[in-house]
Amino acid sequence: MFARHPNLLWLNKQLSILHYLCLVFLAVYYAYPLLFGIMPRKLQLEDENSFVIMGVADPQIEGNHKIEANGFFKGTLDLWGNDLFLRHLVHMNQFWGQPDAMILLGDLVSFQHLDNEEFNKRAKRLKKITGAKNFWQVGNSSLPARTFENGNIPVWTIAGNHDIGYGCESSDAQISKWEQAMGPVNWVSHFNVSKFPVRVIGINSLSLDDVQFYDANPSDIINSKSFSSLGILALSKEARDAWQFLFDIALEPSIPTILFTHVPLYKPANVCVDEPRIVRQLDFRVKSQNHLSYNTTMKIFELIPSIKLVLSGHDHMGCDYEHPNGAIEHTLPSAMGYFGGNIGFVKLIATNDVLTESSKNTPSVVTFLIQKLIGQRWKKASLKQSKFSSDIYATYTLSHGGPSYIWWALHISVCVLTILRLLVISLQHI
């Protein structure tokens, strides 16, 4: 029949080529985490001696304000599309990386002054996006072993400035709204990597700088009665709660620790895209900030010197930094937006019985591997080494899926080309 319609035959061939190319690109896009070394754990020798944490920063889920600004149809369609893309990012990386736990590093919603009803709606959408039945209700809890095998991994949450506001905006109402939907703002949890214990701490970083520091000669922390002995004057209940929480943690036995914080720790200028800046009100409470202050950062490390790794958000472009005390901080770039599509992985691996002979003979018994992207060039950057503990080494990998328009372009192209090919084929019967 196409012989009678040579133009249709030519058109069908061109559409077929484009169609198959789009299908190939789409298949590659759904396997893109493999390009960054995110692969099924059963293919890796250290499977039984590792613990994997998947990090998502700054999704900033929108809601009613988008609909009010753009109209019901356009706003609803936009929200649906954003949720669909974010769910794709999370589930594809979860499928390939098989994490034991997930951490949402703050700015989970787009506006800190939502009423309870709207906030709960967005929290419900976030559960659907992440696949969480409930956000992990941590206290001083321990995680069950091999949680990824049943697909029901714990999802930890950290509050960001778009969730509860900066220090001057925090209140009992803001904290209560967050904790009812997302869990505690300050929490600690424990897990084992093989037989070796690891502690993770989540902190309300928005209130940590709502303090004034003064000179003090503190006694031994273990023998002190309150954090005031460290020269800290809290300016709000939230700041007092956050610092008291850190002080209580300092009294616990010291084990290797990972700190989760929305606002990154202090770094010198020109290290990250965001400069170390804090804007304060006349009453000294924090109005906005890029990093935690130098004093706050030093006090945290003074209280909990066992912090070896820090994961943070807030700086949408991301940053990697080794603090003077040797702690490594990874600020995850944003999961959404033009610079979005980023998911981070930290894998902690016990050194016992899993290293090859060549690995055992390396200069550093414990290695810290950083696989990082440069912009959107999709290529690996330099490697760095650092020590996590005498029994555990860690790898950090950043998976980059690109902005949402790539995902949409591929899906729409496949749909349009499929329809066009069916239309051309149907024309042969005319």
UniProtKB/Swiss-Prot annotation:
Any single biological process term in GO: GPI anchor biosynthetic process
GO cellular component, one term: endoplasmic reticulum
Molecular function in Gene Ontology: GPI-mannose ethanolamine phosphate phosphodiesterase activity
Domain of life: Eukaryota
Range of residues in the leader sequence: none
Transmembrane stretches, start-end: 20-40, 405-425
Entry keyword Transcription: no
Disulfide pairings: none
Subcellular location: Membrane
Keyword Lipid metabolism: no
Family annotation (InterPro entries): Calcineurin-like_PHP_ApaH (IPR004843), Metallo-depent_PP-like (IPR029052), PGAP5/Cdc1/Ted1 (IPR033308), Ted1_MPase_dom (IPR033307)
Membrane topology category: Multi-pass membrane protein
Pfam families from the UniProt entry: Metallophos
Protein name: Uncharacterized protein C23A1.02c
